[in-house]
A protein has these predicted regions:
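Long, charged/polar, soluble alpha-helical segments
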Residues: 1-89
């Protein structure tokens, strides 16, 4: 069984934070999907904030899960054409 190390958790925080900072919505503001894009970003940011909360409480597993949900929302938005490609490096 793999162990969730502090290093792994920090790496996931960095990847998700970078994706949130570099995110670019590619649908115009007058496109009907713009509100959907904003919802995806907001949801991802909320999961990222949850991850920080869990980390501060010492709950690494929940922090890791919340980070995966956050990144999942960003990746889903990219997949349906709301965002530019997200860098993983």
């Amino acid at each position: 069984m793999d162990t969730l190390t502090d290093e792994r958790l920090e790496r996931e925080f960095k990847v998700t934070e970078k994706a949130l900072k570099e995110l670019k919505i590619i649908v115009s503001k007058d496109d009907k999907n713009h509100e959907k894009a904003l919802h995806f970003v907001d949801t991802a940011k909320r999961y990222y904030a949850d991850a920080k909360f869990f980390k501060e409480k010492g709950d690494k597993a929940s922090a890791f899960g919340a980070l995966n949900y956050a990144f999942g929302w960003l990746d889903a938005g990219k997949s349906i054409g709301l965002f530019e490609a997200i860098s993983l490096s």
